[in-house]
Amino acid sequence: MSVGMGIDLEAFRKSQRADGFASILAIGTANPPNVVDQSTYPDYYFRVTNNEDNTDLKDKFKRICERSAIKKRHMYLTEEILKKNPELCAFLEVPSLDTRQAMLAAEVPRLGKEAAEKAIEEWGQPKSRITHLIFCTTTTPDLPGADFEVAKLLGLHPSVKRVGVFQHGCFAGGTVLRLAKDLAENNRGARVLVVCSENTAVTFRGPSETHLDGLVGLALFGDGASALIVGADPIPQVEKPCFEIVWTAQTVVPNSDGAISGKLREVGLTFQLKGAVPDLISTNIEKCLVEAFSQFNISDWNQLFWIAHPGGHAILDQVEASLNLDPTKLRATRHVMSEYGNMSSACVHFILDETRKASRQNGCSTSGGGFQMGVLFGFGPGLTVETVVLKSIPFP
């Protein structure tokens, strides 16, 4: 259709669209330097929160940590910080939100910047080529948001188009890929910087006999940030894609209200986790796979490479059993969980990074461990599932 003085708006619309799928062009990760050993964490935790006399509860926490399949985690909160801010070590008795947010407002963008700089360095292109920024966190609700702060720390151009993804939790690592795909494929030449930065200072608190799900969270979560450069139609010989984002979906698991939830209050973000979560995910995940891969005539889930959010070892065990997966399929997920714990939205990007690196080190033919097609799953509050179909890139 032509309008005005011979302007062809339809041609203009088509010219704005990319030709190919969005690709992940670079990945960067970052963690705080403070490392917590899971085997000694119960003793440390009950000491710094002044609960050493509660030996029965400490024994329960030890068993939770022993069953977590986690070796170590990175945490911003050190013993020195906790001693200076004892309100963080109370359970729900003392308001602490101001203290937490003062920390998070600085640390969340800072760690995000660190991951972003690594991704930009790998990408090898000037920051001036970044057209969009997607920033994700489940921590700080300040205005302007952490997206603004990261853009400022990185020195991005003021015209970079920002999108904030806040309070989504563990499924958001898939959400940001879905958004990045839409932005990259509908804006020719766009280069989208995706940053996820998560910090457990928002949830750390003392123990309680009446809130054992809080102890589960304290045994699982760690701090980390991830960053990716996403764009369609990579420049040959200049940009080096590692995965293509083929298809995305989001769904809410039936009858799962309240299975995973968090409430931001004066005492920080309180965490609720029901024991039914592994069952809910494992009994519904095949529906997501069928929806995603029937259009590609794929029904053998062992013919995919897997990037699954490590919500906990019970979830992974039940998914593996329900789908009869080869144990190698979740190897990268289990490795990241073991070394870093559950870093919420950033986790699946760490697993993507681990998958491509292990694939090259092991002499595989593609970035997906020798497989062409793969799936990325994010699980989180709702209970929400993000499904992302990925295509690997052949190694030269």
Curated annotation (Swiss-Prot):
Superkingdom: Eukaryota
Pathway stated in the Swiss-Prot or TrEMBL entry: Phytoalexin biosynthesis; pinosylvin biosynthesis
InterPro entries linked to this entry: Chalcone/stilbene_synt_C, Chalcone/stilbene_synt_N, Chalcone/stilbene_synthase_AS, Polyketide_synthase_type-III, Thiolase-like
Annotated CDD domains: CHS_like
Catalytic activity: (E)-cinnamoyl-CoA + 3 malonyl-CoA + 3 H(+) = (E)-pinosylvin + 4 CO2 + 4 CoA; 3-phenylpropanoyl-CoA + 3 malonyl-CoA + 3 H(+) = dihydropinosylvin + 4 CO2 + 4 CoA
Noted pH dependence of activity: Optimum pH is 6.
Site-annotated residues for Responsible for the different enzymatic properties of STS1 and STS2: H313
Keyword Cytoplasm listed: yes
Annotated GO MF terms: pinosylvin synthase activity
Segments passing through the bilayer: none
Active site: residue positions: C170
Keyword tags: Acyltransferase, Cytoplasm, Stress response, Transferase
One cellular component term from this protein's GO annotations in UniProt: cytoplasm
Signals that turn on the gene: By stress.
EC number annotated for this UniProt entry: 2.3.1.146
Compartment(s) of residence: Cytoplasm
Annotated positions binding substrate: K60, F61, K62, R63, L273, G311, G312, H313
Miscellaneous comment text of the record: STS1 has only 3-5% of the activity of STS2 and synthesizes a second unknown product with cinnamoyl-CoA.
Family (UniProt): Belongs to the thiolase-like superfamily. Chalcone/stilbene synthases family.
Subunit architecture: Homodimer.
UniProt function note: Catalyzes the production of pinosylvin from cinnamoyl-CoA and malonyl-CoA, and dihydropinosylvin from dihydrocinnamoyl-CoA.
Name of the featured protein: Pinosylvin synthase 1
Species, as recorded: Pinus strobus
This protein's encoding gene: STS1
